[in-house]
Amino acid sequence: MPNSERHGGKKDGSGGASGTLQPSSGGGSSNSRERHRLVSKHKRHKSKHSKDMGLVTPEAASLGTVIKPLVEYDDISSDSDTFSDDMAFKLDRRENDERRGSDRSDRLHKHRHHQHRRSRDLLKAKQTEKEKSQEVSSKSGSMKDRISGSSKRSNEETDDYGKAQVAKSSSKESRSSKLHKEKTRKERELKSGHKDRSKSHRKRETPKSYKTVDSPKRRSRSPHRKWSDSSKQDDSPSGASYGQDYDLSPSRSHTSSNYDSYKKSPGSTSRRQSVSPPYKEPSAYQSSTRSPSPYSRRQRSVSPYSRRRSSSYERSGSYSGRSPSPYGRRRSSSPFLSKRSLSRSPLPSRKSMKSRSRSPAYSRHSSSHSKKKRSSSRSRHSSISPVRLPLNSSLGAELSRKKKERAAAAAAAKMDGKESKGSPVFLPRKENSSVEAKDSGLESKKLPRSVKLEKSAPDTELVNVTHLNTEVKNSSDTGKVKLDENSEKHLVKDLKAQGTRDSKPIALKEEIVTPKETETSEKETPPPLPTIASPPPPLPTTTPPPQTPPLPPLPPIPALPQQPPLPPSQPAFSQVPASSTSTLPPSTHSKTSAVSSQANSQPPVQVSVKTQVSVTAAIPHLKTSTLPPLPLPPLLPGDDDMDSPKETLPSKPVKKEKEQRTRHLLTDLPLPPELPGGDLSPPDSPEPKAITPPQQPYKKRPKICCPRYGERRQTESDWGKRCVDKFDIIGIIGEGTYGQVYKAKDKDTGELVALKKVRLDNEKEGFPITAIREIKILRQLIHRSVVNMKEIVTDKQDALDFKKDKGAFYLVFEYMDHDLMGLLESGLVHFSEDHIKSFMKQLMEGLEYCHKKNFLHRDIKCSNILLNNSGQIKLADFGLARLYNSEESRPYTNKVITLWYRPPELLLGEERYTPAIDVWSCGCILGELFTKKPIFQANLELAQLELISRLCGSPCPAVWPDVIKLPYFNTMKPKKQYRRRLREEFSFIPSAALDLLDHMLTLDPSKRCTAEQTLQSDFLKDVELSKMAPPDLPHWQDCHELWSKKRRRQRQSGVVVEEPPPSKTSRKETTSGTSTEPVKNSSPAPPQPAPGKVESGAGDAIGLADITQQLNQSELAVLLNLLQSQTDLSIPQMAQLLNIHSNPEMQQQLEALNQSISALTEATSQQQDSETMAPEESLKEAPSAPVILPSAEQTTLEASSTPADMQNILAVLLSQLMKTQEPAGSLEENNSDKNSGPQGPRRTPTMPQEEAAACPPHILPPEKRPPEPPGPPPPPPPPPLVEGDLSSAPQELNPAVTAALLQLLSQPEAEPPGHLPHEHQALRPMEYSTRPRPNRTYGNTDGPETGFSAIDTDERNSGPALTESLVQTLVKNRTFSGSLSHLGESSSYQGTGSVQFPGDQDLRFARVPLALHPVVGQPFLKAEGSSNSVVHAETKLQNYGELGPGTTGASSSGAGLHWGGPTQSSAYGKLYRGPTRVPPRGGRGRGVPY
């Protein structure tokens, strides 16, 4: 097809009708020789091919007429690469190889060749000799020199030959000159490029028997082959349009068959046919024979991948092989480039003949062709040049012979011929060129190939076409039909296989050729038309139906018997050409007869081309159907890569890329239809594929392409439909090991989800192993207490985007409103014993499930335990989890589990651990639920082990026999031996819970209870989750670890700002800066607002106005709720709300505070401004100095100064309230001036302040104050003097301190009433300013709480420093950040909780009263909210120092004193609820490095 069309085009371009006829005889003889040579090659390589060719010969002859281009072997071989049709490809390749071999052998001995073939052989021999001499000269010279030399020689020869041809006929001359040019060009290419090409071909073909045979001969052959190919390529536009012929591969196959028929039809029709059918059968379809080379080449070429592969491969490999530089050679020598350069440059002498003879269109074509090919298919360019090289090699062989024969007369005639070609051929070329230009416009990339092929091919092709037409006429029409059918079948297969790929290029090629060939064909067409006349109607079918029908016949085609089927198939194909012709009538009808065969191959292509523009989808469909053939490219790499890359590279790579892209689009649309087509194609390929390799490629290609498409489709459904953009991201709620966690809403269902981001950009080794583990494990864990992973989505629409730009995956989890750490640190909630039972029951059920599934969680901590508002617990974050084999004792890393929850065996270096490690972590959480803060808070492994030893006893062989076997036992064991005092420290918790805690925190892992045993414990066995009332959780605020961290940082930053800046303004600024954020965290604020409200409404209004501006809606709502509910409350009422009333002393103090507040409200508000400055400064100083500020006075001062800054006032009020409480409690605890000393140190210690910041929400004071009633029992200060002092101090301080505090509080409250809510929210900022560091309790910020918070925070970081500054005063409990943090934390937790959760506040206060009774009374009176802080501060000091809280703090922090102190235990027990809150979170918030 390509040849005939190209011939037609070339003929038209070369010399109109006469050109066509003359070239037919001359070119036909050379073509027949080439075919002869190819046939001999083919026979030499395969008698099968000869037989098959013989069978196909009739069809080939007829198709040769119609599909001459396909017959061109070099064309076909390059086209075969281009074509998806492996048969054609194989045939081309075989023919090329055989031609190469046969070029030599043909020279030596012409196998059965018709006169044409013999004459061609003679021409080829002459040309070969010339080429050999040229090659020798070019070999002597550089490859470029060879190319240029051969081009010049070729140009000269072409000129001579062109002149001779001009004498013969302008068309023949133009064609022959073009052929000669192409020959010389290809000779040059062959010489320089052919060596490389033969090398690359050998490399490629080495896998092929043909290649192996040819490779040695190739250099000698390669010129011949290139000449032969050249002539054949010239004969068939397919050579010129190899890149296109890739797509035309079927056409080309047919063309090669037809062309062989052409060449053979007169005398070597059988041979040519034998070549063609075997070509079809073995090369095109018998991918096995040539399956790797022709079939896989073609099909690979057909397949976008093979094409691309072959194209790029050929560029660098095959093309560079053929031409020194695939691009350079192509550009200079490539049919398009060389034509362009020839027509445009001195080389034009030859090229001008071709391009001129071809016509401006050709030059345009070559320019547009080469441009497009260069631009669109640089890869194809190389492919094209290889294509052309094949044309040049095959046509070049013929042309070189012709040139040599004509050389004598051609020298003079060439110049004339050039001129004549320039004019006559140029005009037809112009006409064709206009059509071609349009075609090239349609597919310039395809056109460049077809143009090149046509340019070289038209001359030879016209001759060949005419010759073939004569031969075809001479030969049986049946043969023609068979050849046509075979060609068409090949074309169909190629079109089907390549159709998608090649059909576009082919269509362009053929369309391009069509104009020229149409003219030529018009002259030539009459004979072939009758053959195709009947078939034309099916043309429409040709694109899809013939592809499918030819495929079935194609398998027969491989077998000689299939020739009969081929005629039937030929009708189909003929119909395709006919319809193609009909479609192409303007250009094609004239071509029809010559193009008939071409029409069979090319018309389908043309139809494809025409259809391609519109039926591009169909072509992609063809591609899709071709995709099954695409598997051939895998063959391509071996044998086919060399040939197919050459042929396929130029046009196929670019086209392929485009087609692949189109495929993506088309694939999506046509895939369903094309998959059937592909299925049909694969059948065709399978039949020709009688050779398994092609089928495998087919299957592979489909698997690669279709599956890829399918995968992409699945990807689109999996990725595209479920991309991250399907979720509305609400905000960030956490930070994981490999990314962030976002709260999002599913746009489709409206469901809330958590998106855990898995970032890949920073991953050196791809997908994070932790994420892979988590995904793998979570898919196996389905339990109500294990978080459910719903799906995985990405931030890309499909996988290809992922390759280009590393994106991220998102694990989609069900959304949980809170995590345990956020809730505990928030101070917004207090968990009752029933709640703790429920939580532990669910937690242990989930853990037992994991352990039964043999998974170790290895990272259980409060932040990985999620809760929703209904009280449901889920275990999350399985990034460190792993499968555990109990039967196999193997080492695992001991660097797992967050330090605070890490069991002693891991700290001592155990690597063969068991699920008991998770039970220890759950035991730590159980203690934390009661104490409200982590019970072991250290920042170093050694310190962590020390804390554990102080509470649980030192690890020793007596209690833990195997401990001496642990690696770090000797290096890590505590210097001091401790006895186990866990029961003493936690005596305040229920006995059932204490028993469970004792068992869970057993040092020896072998004696530690299992998850299953915990569920059978008295504490959990009777728990019925369904009957448990859900805890009162803050629905208005999602409490997550990240949120609590931010609050802590804000408070810390505020405190830090306060400390450094001497002026309160900076503190205020800092406070205000932080206030907005703290406001969000101001959940604790509600309790404080209540006190403020109680104090005065005017101050409330003022404070509210300022603070409101800085608060969120949620914060404001909380404050408003608190204010509204508590605005009218009196201090006693506030005390009740805060549970402070439980203590009679507290009530009395609150009443006194109420009175003093009312009296001092006005004066205090004024004084506070002035006082605040001094207090703040003093506070700043105090933080730096362990000395305690005159908490009451300073607090008052700070509060008073705050009026200037409402936020500062709020912060000051909270601080004052805290300090007020602290002074009473902290002074007592400090065993120093209760008024100034205790408060100062607590708050003064920079470390405590920091920790306070860490524990920012020390709003517990109000809540903890209520627990103070339990305080009286604690007052016996069994712990250090602190408790005694606290108990006495509260009473002692209560009068003086209370008066001062009441005054201070009353002043702040006058303003704070409105500010208290703000205080709560703004207070945090204020607290930051007022107190060096925000404590969990806002009150803490001002005084002890701040110190406690700081201590808690610093407990891990700078426990000693805090201990030194505060501990001296505070006692060992305080020394431990735990004690301070407990109090501070309690304050923050309770304070926060008191406002929203009175019950929580009550519990906390129940605990607080111990230390706070007297002192707390004042704080509570002063400001319920502020009082909270104060009470809590005292509670911290007293509770931690005197009571269990202090003990808890100490035990938690690891300070030994209070842990051991029995009084502390009792105090703790009394203050249990309050202190629990205080110690747990405060310490954690501050000390926890979450």
UniProtKB/Swiss-Prot annotation:
UniProt crosslink position (Glycyl lysine isopeptide (Lys-Gly) (interchain with G-Cter in SUMO2)): 263, 509, 655
Chain intervals with Basic and acidic residues compositional bias: 1-13, 87-106, 120-134, 142-162, 184-195, 226-235, 428-458, 479-525, 654-666
Regulation: Inhibited by the ATP analog flavopiridol, purvalanol A, purvalanol B, staurosporine and CR8.
Every Protein kinase domain range: 727-1020
Catalytic residues identified in the record: 859
Keyword Glycoprotein listed: no
CDD domains, alphabetized: STKc_CDK12
UniProt-listed SMART domains: S_TKc (SM00220)
Phenotype when changing residue 877 to N: Abolishes kinase activity
Entry's Gene Ontology BP terms: cellular response to estrogen stimulus; mRNA processing; negative regulation of intracellular estrogen receptor signaling pathway; negative regulation of MAPK cascade; negative regulation of stem cell differentiation; positive regulation of transcription by RNA polymerase II; positive regulation of transcription elongation by RNA polymerase II; regulation of MAP kinase activity
Chain sites annotated for binding ATP: 733-741, 756, 814-819, 1040
Keyword Cell inner membrane: no
InterPro entries for the chain: CDK, Kinase-like_dom_sf, Prot_kinase_dom, Protein_kinase_ATP_BS, Ser/Thr_kinase_AS
Top-rank taxon: Eukaryota
Tissue expression pattern: Widely expressed.
Subcellular localization(s) per the UniProt record: Nucleus; Nucleus speckle
Post-translational modification Phosphoserine, affected residues: 236, 249, 265, 274, 276, 301, 303, 310, 312, 318, 323, 325, 332-334, 338, 341, 343, 345, 383, 385, 400, 420, 423, 614, 644, 681, 685, 889, 1053, 1083
Residues where Phosphothreonine is found: 57, 514, 692, 893, 1244, 1246
GO molecular function, one term: protein kinase binding
Ranges of biased composition (kind: Polar residues): 250-276, 466-478, 1071-1083, 1161-1171
Ranges of Acidic residues composition bias in the record: 72-84
Function: Cyclin-dependent kinase that phosphorylates the C-terminal domain (CTD) of the large subunit of RNA polymerase II (POLR2A), thereby acting as a key regulator of transcription elongation. Regulates the expression of genes involved in DNA repair and is required for the maintenance of genomic stability. Preferentially phosphorylates 'Ser-5' in CTD repeats that are already phosphorylated at 'Ser-7', but can also phosphorylate 'Ser-2'. Required for RNA splicing, possibly by phosphorylating SRSF1/SF2.
Quaternary assembly: Interacts with CCNL1 and CCNL2. Interacts with CCNK.
Disease connection: Chromosomal aberrations involving CDK12 may be a cause gastric cancer. Deletions within 17q12 region producing fusion transcripts with ERBB2, leading to CDK12-ERBB2 fusion leading to trunctated CDK12 protein not in-frame with ERBB2.
Protein name according to UniProt: Cyclin-dependent kinase 12
Lineage: Eukaryota, Metazoa, Chordata, Craniata, Vertebrata
